[in-house]
From Swiss-Prot:
Source taxonomy: Eukaryota, Metazoa, Chordata, Craniata, Vertebrata
Subcellular location: Membrane
Parts of the chain on the Extracellular side: 1-41, 105-118, 182-207, 282-289
Disulfide bonds: C115-C192
Name this polypeptide is given: Blue-sensitive opsin
Membrane topology listed for this record: Multi-pass membrane protein
Family affiliation: Belongs to the G-protein coupled receptor 1 family. Opsin subfamily.
Superkingdom, taxonomy of origin: Eukaryota
Record field: transmembrane: 42-66, 79-104, 119-138, 158-181, 208-235, 258-281, 290-314
């Protein structure tokens, strides 16, 4: 049966040919989207989103509580990690939970207004998380590489860094609320995000996608690569100068490993969205498998779980305090880990060039 042209809808868009000219009857706000996938794929996504909701909420609440509980964790450089936890919490409690309920029902049961709210909040949280990763890199470059001499990193600088992540995130996430792009159901139509699909219409989605690619992917990724590249260069120079120092050699290996993991974590989270959005812009009008359109959203929401693992659990001092909190004051790793962490942090922080 030949597919018919689709009518344009203000609140949703299904980018595949359908055997009906009454697309309103298949609205993702009204009926289960069984025409897009079998019950198995919806059940898999339901379980996955439930895992992200429980895991993301638990680990980020634990990060915040642990920081409040232990004074030693309330250093200026850790402010941005708490900021990251707050943004992740926003995504997991709003984005992942809403997606879980919707996948369970196989359509977005909350309606078009809630879709716009969920899309905005999840995008805002995701953007804050994204910018937090670049601020983490910038702050470490500032403290370790000392590009401005013996710069003293204070609480004011940390707060400014956190505030900038929210400012940039609002700059990127609010335009769809005012007509530059729009928030609609994406992928299997059970979660909402910016409109990556439609082209050549009043929403100017192509220009918005290019704006996001440059401002929210290209620029932060450049900052991360530059800062971590400089950091590794500084550590390698220090390691050569102190070839007999086992602690310096160990610090270099540990930081190199962490940098690689951090860069890969950023790419895993945001490269699928960036690639998918660009593909849509440069292949206008082509249909695609909606299950593939769901993948970028899955990766970005999954970052609420794996980013804390990278940035918090790979921090030995943070991990030690977290284990003490979980095990009622007794860390199963003992106190040696915390001591070695302090020693290593001191070693790494002092390798920058003198000005």
């Amino acid at each position: 049966m030949k597919s018919r042209p689709q009518e344009f809808q203000e609140d949703f868009y299904i980018p595949i040919p359908l055997d009906t000219n009454n697309i309103t009857a298949l609205s993702p706000f009204l009926v289960p989207q069984d025409h897009l996938g079998g019950s198995g794929i919806f059940m898999i996504m339901t379980v996955f989103m439930l895992f992200l909701f429980i895991g993301g909420t638990s680990i980020n609440v634990l990060t915040i509580v642990c920081t409040v509980q232990y004074k030693k964790l309330r250093s200026h450089l850790n402010y941005i990690l708490v900021n990251l936890a707050i943004s992740n919490l926003l995504v997991s409690t709003v984005g992942s939970f809403t997606a879980f309920v919707s996948f369970l029902n196989r359509y977005f049961i909350f309606g078009p207004t809630a879709c716009k709210i969920e899309g905005f909040v999840a995008t805002l949280g995701g953007m804050v998380s994204l910018w937090s990763l670049s601020v983490v890199a910038f702050e470490r470059w500032l403290v370790i590489c000392k590009p401005v001499g013996n710069f003293s990193f204070k609480g004011t600088h940390a707060i400014i860094g956190c505030a900038l992540t929210w400012f940039f995130a609002l700059l990127a996430s609010t335009p769809p609320l005012f007509g530059w792009s729009r928030y609609i159901p994406e992928g299997l139509q059970c979660s909402c995000g910016p409109d990556w699909y439609t082209t050549e219409n009043k929403y100017n989605n192509e220009s918005y996608v290019m704006f996001l690619f440059c401002f929210c992917f290209g620029f932060p990724f450049t900052v991360i690569l530059f800062c971590y590249g400089q950091l590794l260069f500084t550590l390698k120079s220090a390691a050569k100068a102190q070839a007999d120092s086992a602690s310096t050699q160990k610090a270099e290996r540990e930081v190199t490993k962490m940098v690689v993991v951090m860069v890969m974590g950023f790419l895993v989270c945001w490269l699928p969205y960036a690639s998918f959005a660009l593909w849509v812009v440069f292949n206008r009008g082509q249909s695609f498998d909606l299950r593939l359109g769901t993948i970028p959203s899955c990766f970005s929401k999954a970052s609420t779980v794996y980013n804390p693992v990278i940035y918090v659990f790979m921090n030995k001092q943070f991990r030690s305090c977290m284990m003490k909190l979980i095990f009622c004051g007794k860390s199963p790793f003992g106190d040696d880990e915390e001591a070695s962490s302090s020693s290593q942090v001191t070693q790494v922080s002092s390798v920058g060039p003198e000005k």
